[in-house]
């Protein structure tokens, strides 16, 4: 294991140190997504499906417009993934009161998949962060939050 003190030298945040952070993000994200990726691969889904299932599960009756705002993808990109999830009965589509708004809800099948995928990631995160104190964890969360662009921080705040 790399010596964390060698990885973290905040007084000398030069390009070399920033590149270490880039690499840490790459490797941690790769490992963070690897468990769910294996499950998704078995049902011929990918990370785009995972993101849609996650956010539809997080907020019941999420509109397509809201989902597009969260994911920041085009309607065309969402359409392919969403149609597959609806056709395979992971997501239920309902028409809003004004007949123009489409609302998304996870089906029982979708809830089960979302839980299965999230449980892996929650467990992975918990097994790491339980070794740190609240100050360290909040510092980590603060860094991640500040890496989000201002307008996207508002989206994050709205869903939390």
Regions found by a protein language model. Name each.
Residues 34-77:
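N-terminal helix-turn-helix DNA-binding core of bacterial DNA-binding proteins
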Residues 1-13, 134-160:
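C-terminal regulatory/oligomerization modules of transcriptional regulators
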Residues 29, 114, 148-152:
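A structural signal for well-ordered alpha-helices, especially hydrophobic packing surfaces
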Residues 1-43:
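N-terminal leader segment of winged-helix/HTH proteins
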Residues 27-28, 76, 107:
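Short amphipathic alpha-helix starts
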Residues 26, 54-58, 118:
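Short, locally clustered residues in the helix-turn-helix/winged-helix DNA-binding domain
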Residues 33, 83-142:
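Charged, amphipathic alpha-helical coiled-coil/dimerization segments
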